[in-house]
From Swiss-Prot:
Keywords (A to Z) from UniProt: Cytoplasm, Developmental protein, Differentiation, Nucleus, Spermatogenesis
Region of interest: Disordered: 1-39, 168-188, 202-264, 340-393
Encoding gene (name): Tbata
Name of the protein described by the UniProt record: Protein TBATA
Bias-annotated ranges (Basic and acidic residues): 20-34, 205-227, 380-393
Length: 393
């Protein structure tokens, strides 16, 4: 029995299928960076330990084996700065699996920018410096970041959606802080109401134009031809065919002014609103449209009534008022009163004129002055022929 055990120990049992394979020299095949330092252990053919393989898969121990000289060849792992920049570094970047959302199940690379986050319940990352082959320190990120403490909206708003929120529009330092004022049309309605109240007051002040006397229609002469009419302007007869055309043209001219009047009225209303807006800027002593909008929307009624009175007086001063209708006799007497003191002053200060003054003219031939102009009255009773005969005699 002892001899059999010794034979078994010297020659282990080999399965009939497993045959010893000749040793092959390792070929210089390119390896990835993750296969660096991984050395295959010698495996006895025919004997497989599944428990050992399962444990190795569960807990992979980091191998701290020194690299062989063949690892520094070109094509294998190189610690030159070119390869560290242009190739992925599995030792320096780790990936975490995001759970809880289907659209974020892809892995997110962890970088050192996550260190700036200061959310409640977030543990700081452990950054351990390690030296490169050249002696330069390399920052290695360890995966100790917990996503359970982060709520979903804060994670999305701070980590993923890193765009800064702009509260003030770009380009206008004194922008409209209340954007509802510019979008709403309520302030425009208030301004239109205020302008209408001002215009109603000004219409009452404006003098009514004198009603033009309607000229009596000219009596047309009886038609000499059937359907023909005589025109006093041209002195010709207008045939009946052209009359229909002229009537249509007149009707068209009557229709068009109504549409034009509507456009003119709309433009006048817009001009009135602009005028009221400009006067409000002067009354409120501001050049900000936002301030005027706020005043139109939220000003008390007493303040608006006070501003309305100021607007009415300002608009009334802008309206050109006609001269008061003075009777002609009063105007004539007033001009004569102004003329008499001027004549007395000239007579007092010019004594030499008394000697050379011509004899006074009769009242009938005495010129009358309107300002500095002389007005000579021609008597209609005397004919010019009679005057010439008297002068000849």
């Amino acid at each position: 029995m002892t001899t059999e055990v010794n034979q078994l120990s010297e020659h282990p049992l080999v399965s009939p299928k497993a045959e010893p394979q000749p040793e092959t020299k390792p070929e210089n095949l390119p390896r990835s960076h993750g296969d660096v330092g991984l050395q295959k252990e010698t495996v006895v053919p025919g004997i497989v330990d599944f428990e050992l393989i399962h444990e190795e898969l569960k807990t992979t121990k980091p191998q701290t084996s020194q690299p062989t000289p063949s690892a520094y060849r070109f094509g294998r792992l190189s610690h030159h700065s070119f390869f560290s920049r242009h190739h992925p570094q599995p030792q320096r970047v780790t990936h975490i699996q995001v759970t809880g959302r289907e659209d974020l199940e892809h892995s997110l690379p962890l970088t050192t920018s996550f260190q700036l986050l200061q959310a409640p319940g977030v543990q700081p990352m452990d950054l351990t410096p390690s030296a490169d082959i050249a002696g330069k320190p390399v920052c290695v990120v360890r995966d100790e970041f917990s996503l359970s403490a982060l709520t979903q909206p804060t994670f999305l708003s701070r980590c993923l959606m890193g765009m800064p929120t702009i509260s003030v529009p770009i380009g206008d330092p004194q922008s409209n802080r209340n954007p509802q004022l510019s979008t709403s049309d309520t302030w425009r309605k208030k301004l239109k109401d205020l302008a209408s109240r001002v215009t109603v007051f000004t219409k009452e002040i404006q003098p009514k134009p004198d009603e033009q006397k309607e000229e009596p229609p000219l009596r047309e002469p009886p038609p000499r031809e059937q359907g023909a009419k005589y025109s006093a302007e041209t002195g010709r007869l207008i045939p009946a065919s052209s009359q229909a055309l002229t009537r249509r043209n007149r009707q068209g001219q009557r229709v068009h002014p109504s549409s034009k009047d509507g456009g003119v009225q709309a433009s006048i209303l817009q001009d009135q609103e602009l005028l009221i807006l400009e006067l409000l800027c002067q009354i409120l002593q501001t050049d900000s449209l936002r301030a005027i909008q706020f005043w139109l929307l939220y000003a008390p009624s007493k303040e608006k009534d006070l501003a309305l009175g100021l607007l009415q007086t300002a608009v009334a001063q802008l309206i050109p008022q006609p001269l008061s209708s003075i009777p002609a006799e009063k105007l004539w007497n007033h001009l004569q009163e102004l003329q008499e003191p001027q004549e007395t002053q000239e007579a007092a200060y010019s004594p030499s004129l008394k000697k050379t003054r011509s004899p006074p003219l009769p009242k009938t031939d005495k010129p009358e002055y309107i300002g500095k102009a002389q007005v000579l009255l021609v008597h209609p009773s005397e004919d010019p022929e009679e005057k010439t005969t008297k002068a000849e005699s």
